A protein has these predicted regions:
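Glycine-centered, small-residue-biased loops immediately flanking beta-strands
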Residues: 137
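A conserved beta-strand element that flanks and buttresses the S-adenosyl-L-methionine
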Residues: 109
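Helix-to-beta-strand junctions that scaffold the AdoMet/dcAdoMet cofactor pocket
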Residues: 118, 133-134
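Hydrophobic adenine-recognition pocket in adenosine-nucleotide-binding enzymes
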Residues: 113
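Class I (Rossmann-like) S-adenosyl-L-methionine-dependent methyltransferase catalytic domain
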Residues: 1-45, 49-101, 117-124, 128, ...
Length: 205
C-alpha cells in the first residue's frame, strides 16, 4: 500500500484534512476560487454541498450560508467554529427533496465533490443544484480533471485521489449540460503546490 492509500482514512478526521490541504496551498486556492469564480455578494443565500469543516466560510462576505456534509466530524468542527456567526451546518446526505425544502439559493457550491460520485449520482447533484437556484443563480463545481498532455505526475496523483471518478473536461461538461444550458468552464493548473489540473464549472440557471 502506497503513501496516498495510507493517508486516505486519516483525511476523514478534520484536523488532518485541514493540515493536508494547508500543505497543498488551500488558502491561496480558496481565495482565487472565491474572488474569480464564486464571486459571492453580501446578502447572498449560499448552499455548500459537501462543505467539509467549513473551510470556505472565513473568506465569504456577510451572507446566509448553509453547509451540508455527511461526515459528522466535519460538521461538528464547522459548527464549533462558525455556528455562532449565523452560519448553519447540517449533517446529512443530500437529496433532491431535502434541498427542495430549503428554498432558493443565489449560489450553490460543490467543491471537490463530483469526482467522488458515479455518473448517475453526479447527474442528480446537478439536477438538485439547478432546482435549488433562483433564476440567474449559479452552481460552481471544482474538481480534478484529466487533460491531454497532462504531466505524468499530475495524472498519477489524480489517479490516486480519494475520489474514484476523476473525469475529463468533456465528461464533466456532458453531465452538467443535462441540467444547465449556460456553462462556463475554466481549467487551472496553478491552484495547488503540487502538479494538479483543476476544472471549474460555473453553471447558470
Amino acid at each position: 500500500m502506497g503513501f496516498l492509500e495510507r493517508i486516505r482514512p486519516v483525511l476523514n478526521r478534520p484536523e488532518f484534512y485541514e493540515l493536508f490541504h494547508r500543505i497543498l496551498g488551500a488558502d491561496r486556492r480558496s481565495r482565487i476560487l472565491i474572488n474569480e469564480y464564486m464571486k459571492p455578494k453580501e446578502g447572498d443565500r449560499i448552499l455548500d454541498v459537501g462543505c467539509g469543516p467549513g473551510n470556505f466560510v472565513p473568506y465569504l462576505p456577510e451572507c446566509r450560508y448553509l453547509g451540508i456534509d455527511a461526515n459528522s466530524a466535519y460538521i461538528d468542527t464547522a459548527r464549533g467554529r462558525y455556528g455562532t456567526y449565523g452560519k448553519q451546518f447540517i449533517c446529512d446526505t443530500v437529496s433532491y427533496q431535502s434541498v427542495h425544502d430549503l428554498g432558493e439559493f443565489d449560489l450553490v457550491l460543490a467543491i471537490g465533490l463530483l469526482h467522488h460520485l458515479e455518473d448517475d449520482e453526479a447527474h442528480d447533484l446537478f439536477r438538485m443544484g439547478h432546482n435549488a437556484l433562483r433564476a440567474g443563480g449559479r452552481m460552481v463545481t471544482v474538481d480534478g480533471c484529466y487533460v491531454p498532455g497532462q504531466s505524468p505526475v499530475a495524472r498519477y496523483l489524480l489517479s490516486r485521489d480519494r475520489g474514484q471518478f476523476v473525469r475529463t473536461k468533456e465528461a464533466y461538461l456532458n453531465l452538467a449540460s443535462r441540467c444547465f444550458e449556460e456553462i462556463h468552464p475554466s481549467l487551472r493548473d496553478d491552484l495547488l503546490r503540487i502538479p494538479h489540473t483543476t476544472l471549474i464549472l460555473e453553471c447558470v440557471r
